[in-house]
Curated annotation (Swiss-Prot):
GO terms for molecular function: ATP binding; metal ion binding; threonine-tRNA ligase activity; tRNA binding. One of its GO terms (biological process) is threonyl-tRNA aminoacylation. HAMAP family: Thr_tRNA_synth. Keywords: Aminoacyl-tRNA synthetase, ATP-binding, Cytoplasm, Ligase, Metal-binding, Nucleotide-binding, Protein biosynthesis, RNA-binding, tRNA-binding, Zinc. It comes from Pseudarthrobacter chlorophenolicus (strain ATCC 700700 / DSM 12829 / CIP 107037 / JCM 12360 / KCTC 9906 / NCIMB 13794 / A6). NCBIfam families: thrS. This is Threonine--tRNA ligase. CDD domains: TGS_ThrRS (cd01667), ThrRS_anticodon (cd00860), ThrRS_core (cd00771). Residues 260-566 are annotated as: Catalytic. The gene is thrS. Homodimer. Binds 1 zinc ion per subunit. Its cofactor is Zn(2+). It is found in: Cytoplasm.
């Protein structure tokens, strides 16, 4: 073989010579787990020829990118099945998403659960046919001819040059580079049985999907995510490399449903969402109020120890405040509409005194700036750390409101720190350490950090200030030793931020605390302090919310603990259950001793039989159940029954009180 017939590739880090025209499938022929190739950093179908000098890496089906391709290909199979079941269905967009995929369809009737079962069977037939996914590069005219009966695809072709901004999922179908169509080709006859406008890549064939997939639900969705557009029907699904992986995922989903804080909030009588109040406006019941109070009280204690000063600000303000801050320019869509008040009219209807617009506050920072500006400040006062459990109101679309984790009225544990530029990095480091330590005290221990940087279309201030702020935040994050993940364009309009991402007991990631560095609002509010040399200087401002919001954090903790809160947070920490009514008085005496020690304890004196009382305490997820019968009363003891069903019998009352109070004080149970 002559050199002219060969090309050199860098394959998985090693230089390799292959024949000109070699495809990824040929290169990785012996590696059956490879489903696509990464060529010079881009994912490519295995049947594409590899260019001279390319860096090539085999991507396995179990890798993150391989899973995405698997799920995207499964979405195509589902769409093929839908158009077999309903030939008049028009195709929308069908991308992969976290743990699965979806596809949108314009259909006359919504899909039913029975439809999804039928579609799964049809999909399995398609998969078993081992159809090939074949990429075809076409001109725009050819694409329009192929998609002439698909109006939504034709619309996408018109958005090719604006795919990144055109709407939800558009860049899955069209974008920079060639226009491509993927054909599903029947193997025996070699005929195309279905096709879709798509950028790919895809699996080599449907057989690789196997039977490890499921359609999970259907819902409505607006075309391109825009409420002004046609409402379509969306089918969600999931796909995994093996049946065992699918089963494990389904078990995680089932456990997540059991832990759903909305369900547990109702079952445990913690909170509710009355229709009379409106969407996203929860109320906390007495038991939920106890948990919330304990969360807030401990946070207050830790903030005092860390040198924060407490402030309070009103719920509404004149609109001018948010003109100064920039919120009305950059955040108005997230605010409730203005209330126009204080106008005075003459008898003839003419205006004697113009009114003013007032707004429910979406953020506390402008008001904290007014506190800083209320008098002269010296460098000796800095860093000044202001803290507030501040109620804020944000207009979330009704479709995204979700229990406690996405509300319209919330309480932020909001701090704003004012410091000199010289203090900036040390203060950021202290703040991050404080945040992580406090989250650990609430039972979250698995973290990584995300660095959100400037959105070039939506920011205020000088580029140099943004660059300095971003660089400093990155240094602090890297020095923490935690993984740092970039979030390009994710910052608020006034400054970059670090967000702490925490994993719960199910391994799900939640955004918790945010730490934001801001040179811009001090400029807009003309904040100043007198420096050591007598000059007037601008402070640096650090925004920090630890819980994010109290409501959201409580929702996360409810699911993290599956409602079985540690004893220090539990609404009822101890339930005493006498084995018979004869021992009620003895148990009341034990509970009185616990109450005197600050423990939330009660006696179950209901008419239920003893086994039912035990089941009730278990259902209510009580941390400590104390049982007393004749032997216990005679010995001055009680028996412990724990959440896992284990018992510790004959514990002296004084020892029982000590154990419980220590567990609560040390937050160990």
């Amino acid at each position: 073989m002559s050199d002219a017939q060969q090309i050199t590739l860098l394959v998985d880090g090693e230089e390799t010579k292959v024949t000109t025209g070699t495809t990824g499938a040929e290169l990785f022929f012996e590696r059956r787990d490879v489903v696509v190739a990464r060529v010079n950093g881009e994912l490519k179908d295995l049947d594409q020829e590899l260019p001279e000098g390319a860096e090539v890496e085999g991507v396995t089906i179990e890798s993150p990118d391989g899973l995405n391709v698997l799920r995207h290909s499964t979405a195509h199979v589902m769409a093929q099945a839908v158009q077999q079941l309903r030939p008049d269905a028009k195709l929308g967009i069908g991308p992969y998403i976290t743990d699965g995929f979806y596809f949108d369809f314009d259909v006359a009737e919504p899909f039913t659960p029975e439809d999804l079962k039928t579609l799964e069977k049809m999909m399995q037939k398609i998969i078993n046919q081992n159809q090939k996914f074949v990429r075809r590069v076409v001109s725009e005219d050819e694409a329009r001819e192929a998609m002439k009966n698909e109006p939504y695809k034709l619309e996408l072709l018109g958005k090719k040059n604006e795919a990144a901004e055109a709407g939800e999922g558009v860049n899955v179908e069209v974008g920079a580079g060639d226009i491509t169509i993927y054909d599903n080709v029947e193997r025996k006859e070699g005929t195309t049985v279905w096709c879709d406008l798509c950028r790919g890549p895809h699996l080599p064939n449907t057989k690789l999907i196997s039977n490890a997939f499921a359609l999970t639900r259907s819902s409505s969705a607006y075309w391109l995510g825009n409420q002004k557009n046609q409402q379509l029907q969306r089918i969600y699904g999931t796909a995994w490399p093996t049946k065992d992986a699918l089963k494990a995922y389904q078990e995680r989903i089932a456990e997540a449903e059991r832990r759903d804080h909305r369900k547990l909030g109702s079952e445990l009588d913690l909170f509710s969402f009355p229709d009379e109040l409106g969407s996203g406006l929860p109320v906390f019941h007495p038991k939920g109020g106890i948990i919330r109070k304990e969360m807030e009280d401990y946070s207050r204690q830790r903030h005092v120890e860390a040198g924060y000063e407490f402030v309070y600000t009103p719920h509404i303000t004149k609109g001018h405040l948010y003109e100064v801050s920039g919120h009305l320019d950059w955040y108005k869509e997230g605010m409730f509409p203005a209330m126009h008040v204080d106008a005075e009219l003459n008898e003839d209807g003419t205006v004697r005194k113009p009114g003013q617009d007032y707004y429910l506050k979406p953020m506390n920072c402008p008001m904290h700036n007014l506190i800083f500006r209320s008098r002269g400040r010296s460098y000796r006062e800095l860093p000044l750390r202001l803290f507030e459990f501040g109620s804020v109101y944000r207009y979330e679309k009704s479709g995204v409101v979700h229990g406690l984790t996405r509300v319209r009225g919330m309480t932020q544990d909001d701090a704003h720190i004012y410091c000199t530029r010289e203090q900036m990095k040390e203060e950021l480091t202290k703040t991050l350490t404080f945040v992580l330590d406090l989250l650990k005290d609430y039972g979250l221990n698995d973290f990584y950090l995300e660095l959100s940087t400037k959105d070039p279309e939506k920011y205020v201030g000088e580029d140099a200030a943004w660059e300095e702020a971003t660089r400093t935040l990155a240094e602090v994050a890297q020095e923490s030793g935690l993984e740092l993940v970039p979030d390009p364009g994710g910052a608020a309009f006034y400054g970059p931020k670090i967000s702490v991402q925490a994993k719960d007991a199910l391994g799900r990631t939640w955004q918790m605390s945010t730490i934001q560095l801001d040179f811009n609002l001090p400029e807009r509010f003309e904040l100043e302090f007198q420096a050591a040399d007598g000059s007037r200087q601008r402070p640096v401002m650090i925004h920090r919310a630890l819980f994010g919001s109290v409501e959201r954090f409580m929702g996360v903790l409810t699911e993290h603990y599956a409602g079985a809160f540690p004893a220090w947070l539990a609404p009822v920490q101890v339930v005493g259950i006498p084995v018979a009514e004869t021992f009620n008085e003895y148990m009341f005496d034990v509970v009185d001793q616990l109450k005197a020690a600050g423990i939330r304890a009660e006696v179950d004196t209901s008419s239920d039989r003893f086994p039912k009382k035990i089941r009730t305490a278990s259902k209510d997820k009580i941390p400590f159940v104390l049982i007393a019968g004749g032997d216990d009363a005679e010995a001055g003891a009680v028996s412990f029954r724990f959440r896992d069903g284990s018992q510790d019998n004959g514990v002296p009352v004084a020892e029982a009180v000590k154990r419980i109070t220590e567990a609560v004080r040390n937050r160990t149970s």
